[in-house]
Amino acid sequence: MEIKEEYSIELEKKVQEKWEDEKTFKFLDDEKRPPYIIDTPPPYPTGRMHLGHGLNWTYMDIIARFKRMNGYDVLFPQGWDCHGLPTEVKVEELNNITKSDIDRHEFRRLCVELTDENVEKMRGQVRSLGISIDWDREYITMNPDYVRKSQTAFLKMYEKGLIYRGKHPVNWCPRCETAIAFAEVEYQGRTSKLNYIKFPYAENSGKYLEIATSRPELMAACVGIVVHPEDERYSDVVGKTVKVPLFDQEVNVYPDSDVEKEFGTGVVMVCTFGDKTDVTWVNRHKLEVKKAINEKGQLTEICGKYAGKKSDDARKEIISDLISENYMIKQEPLEQNVGSCWRCKTPIEIIVGDQWFVNVTKLLTEVENAANEISWVPEHMKARLMKWIEDMGWDWCISRQRLFATPIPVWYCKDCGEIIVAKPEDLPIDPTKESPYTCKCGNSNLVAETDVLDTWMDSSITPLVIAGWLEDEEFFKKHYPVQLRPQGHDIIRTWAFYTMVRSLAITGEKPWDEIVINGMVFGEDGFKMSKSRGNVVEPGEITKTYGADALRLWASNSTIGKDVPFAWKEVEYGGRFLRKIWNACKFAKMNISDETISELKSLNSISIENPVDLWILSKLNNLISKVSDDLGNYKINTVVEIQKFLWHEFCDNYIEMVKHRLYNKEESESAQQEKLMAQYTLYKVITESVKLLTPFTPHFAEIVGEIYEIDDLHTSWPVSDERLISLENEFVGEVVKNTVASIRRYKSNKGMPLNAELNKVEMYVSDEKDFNAVSKASEDVKKSLKIKELEINLGKPSLEQKISEVTPNKSKIGPEFKKDAGKVMAFIKEADADTIEKMLSEGIETEFGILNKEHIKEVKRAIYNKGEIVETADIDSLIDTIAIIQ
């Protein structure tokens, strides 16, 4: 098969079409091969992949391809995590509506329509990166069958008492107007004011307690005061009653060891609900529950004249009133970490209301045990999950006040308040559309649950769904737990944790054997990519110019678990590397016919004797061994070793050293055998190296694989031939490589063509081992460098540096010697080297007078060997080795 002149990234599209047409990556459930199932992260379908997706999918694909080539039956699906607020916001924006303007089911239809469009766009983007997905195994979380599984998982956990409905404080986003889980709260630094306020004693003694708070707008919901029982300043105030300024309710003072004595005044007001600690104190001291802030982030009617105002506006007015009524003692700057919604970054409130929860606290020990059974890559990432488990204070709030999500399959009896859950056989079901049940009290007039499930309730069952849960019981038993979960470190406390909770609750088993954690992508400026910083690079920008394989090489030159800075120069290097190797493959193919390839396939490499061939084959097999070990341990940046070997050892050196054998037209048996061995070695290095590159640059590998008739490119990983690994062979090869490279550099420095002939080269090698190595490969050295006569000597040469030419200083000699000037210049030109050296150092007495260095304009020196002028080249890395070139 002919090879094109230039490598073109346009070929990548044809390769992708071939894979899809031939279903190259289909999971076969082959009994003869062990399964390897990947719990692929389902991205949110925005319609555009970002570079973080490109990094993560490249990691996954490298692992999938490596496992497939090592004999595994790989199930690598693609999923889409469809539900969520961003789609609702986008639908409102595109249609110039709000979700309250139209019927909820029509609004959901618009969300589904937009999501379908975005999924189709992103399918193409995943394909464009050459990801070896089995598209027959695609799952979409908004599709009816997936909703059925998500609702079934809800029912199973409800039946086990692991899901409950209760009135409970929740993290609430006033911008999104929905509850959010503890794991969805992000903390941001903010400078605010710490307000020192007088709380007068109820007995009107004129005395007061001094309380420090950053949220005076919550004072209407103040239901108690707490002090540390060991704080001597307040030993006499426990049990007393104080009045809340501006709002006048009376509250008691309680002792509590959770109070930080050093913060503020050491006196804390307890509100329902300011933060998590308030929740703890309200429950511990059995205090009244008051609601000061509503779902829109506005103050409620208990706040009197401040009711209806946004929290920030109310705070300003209340502070102003506290000052004017002489309750404010002082204000100090306060640095805080404020909880914010992970999507819109709005500061959260804690409000109380009826919500659905997963009782995660019941499962924490099981999750911890499972985490210890799972292999973590890198290992230290497990600590993040363990820390999350340790800090877990609340159950997981799973109900959301939105529309585009999996419906909670529940109704409420209007008469007795009974909760009625759907039957498994009726799933999927939307209770706002259907009400097929009657309460046990006889009432059929049921109220539908309008809240929906948190989207993590969908994505946290992915390993179950991928392994065939609720589809094929035998398949599921055989394939669950799955082998691998790849994901980012930013969602360990959400996706990883929730998946473990759900899997353990439903099956009692861990979800996967291993979890591989990748980092995030940063811009060239060192900051996280964001539109506001202007440092975003999209995968399409890269692939359009450099191709998918260049992007994949950039991603591969990183360490799993660490954040990755993007750099255009690395992408450009990847493109140059592919062109370099393409040219090497093209050169080799010009010297290896299709008929010769068939012959080479049957040759045994052990019959090779040429030291240069043995050197590169030893290097190759060492490389195979290292790359195999590295990929087995998820060290994907081992691609650097492949690149160094191919570029520097193979292209820059080996090919140059075997050209003379490939070009040899001699018909002798020995010459033809040498040529065949060179062809075999070229073929072997190219085909084995292409296989090594397949997980990293699959398009390039596919194209070269077709040219070189590699039939098992996707199913066979190279095996290192230990017989060919030899330190001695590598030593000999390195000596030859350095000798050839040094003399080639000599030619280049002299402005000579690299293929210029050299009449004679004498090598003097001081080290006996080096001498034997060069001698062993003398023919390759001689013919690679086009040396007519090569002499290799053990020892050091008798070299002398002497003056070879001298130019008299006419401007000095003329005026000084006048009519004898010509004779003086002739004398200087004809003088021997010793005479000139003496003139230069101390001057000499002549018949014309004293001559010294001022009478010489220029001196040229040369190296002499055996009385002849020669040139020399030092041989890199060889001990006291020099080549004398004539």
Swiss-Prot record:
Keyword Ligase found: yes
Catalytically driven reaction(s): tRNA(Val) + L-valine + ATP = L-valyl-tRNA(Val) + AMP + diphosphate
Pfam hit, one: Anticodon_1
Motif ('HIGH' region): 43-53
Positions occupied by motif 'KMSKS' region: 528-532
Location(s) in or outside the cell: Cytoplasm
A single GO cellular-component term on record: cytosol
Biological process according to GO: valyl-tRNA aminoacylation
Residues binding ATP: 531
E.C. number(s) listed in UniProt: 6.1.1.9
Entries under InterPro entries matching the protein: aa-tRNA-synth_I_CS, aa-tRNA-synth_Ia, Anticodon_Ia_Val, M/V/L/I-tRNA-synth_anticd-bd, Rossmann-like_a/b/a_fold, tRNAsynth_Ia_anticodon-bd, Val/Leu/Ile-tRNA-synth_edit, Valine-tRNA_ligase_type_2
Gene Ontology molecular functions: aminoacyl-tRNA deacylase activity; ATP binding; valine-tRNA ligase activity
Task of the protein: Catalyzes the attachment of valine to tRNA(Val). As ValRS can inadvertently accommodate and process structurally similar amino acids such as threonine, to avoid such errors, it has a 'posttransfer' editing activity that hydrolyzes mischarged Thr-tRNA(Val) in a tRNA-dependent manner.
Family assignment from sequence similarity: Belongs to the class-I aminoacyl-tRNA synthetase family. ValS type 2 subfamily.
PANTHER family: VALINE--TRNA LIGASE, CHLOROPLASTIC_MITOCHONDRIAL 2, VALYL-TRNA SYNTHETASES
UniProt domain comment: ValRS has two distinct active sites: one for aminoacylation and one for editing. The misactivated threonine is translocated from the active site to the editing site.
Protein name per Swiss-Prot or TrEMBL: Valine--tRNA ligase
